[in-house]
Curated annotation (Swiss-Prot):
Pfam families: DUF188. Belongs to the UPF0178 family. Signal peptide: none annotated. This is UPF0178 protein Helmi_09130.
């Protein structure tokens, strides 16, 4: 088992927590990001800046039983289909049922924006989200560690 981080848009605290918990539970942590991001990690993979390049590399590295951290619902859907447990940076565990609803919501919002509508941007990250993420990731790693 390994922990895969879609590090392109990953909050710093999520990245720090993931690396720390990976060390504590002796789980290899792979970070994948475009060359625009500098990440200090023993297993950091740098990809080009083309669209979806990070997602493709994460998919290629993923194996059933792995855990992935991403806020990309499309990537999470593909990883779930591959038998990977997916966690969002807010600590939300994505499953097959929930990811379908999230993808549908994303499509509706994109259609609304294409039609000239405006949607709210993301809220500022909170300490509560950091705690929730750390707790959720620790729970997943404990389950794996048995």
């Amino acid at each position: 088992m390994k922990l895969l981080i879609d590090a392109d848009a990953c909050p710093r605290e999520v990245l720090r927590t993931s690396l720390e918990l990976g060390r504590r539970f002796q789980v290899p942590v792979w970070t994948v990001a475009s060359f625009n991001h500098v990440i200090a990690s023993d297993r950091h993979v740098v990809v080009g800046g083309a669209a979806q390049e990070t997602d493709i590399k994460v998919m290629n590295l993923a194996e059933p039983g792995d855990v992935a951290v991403t806020q990309d619902f499309g990537l999470a859907a593909m990883l779930i289909g591959k038998g990977v447990r997916c966690l969002g940076p807010s600590g939300r565990l994505y499953d097959a049922e929930r990811i379908d609803l999230l993808l549908e919501e994303r499509e509706l919002k994109a259609r609304f924006r294409r039609g000239g509508g405006r949607t709210k941007g993301p809220k500022k990250r909170t300490a509560e989200e950091d705690r929730r993420f750390a707790g959720a990731l620790e729970t997943l790693l404990r389950e794996w560690n048995g």
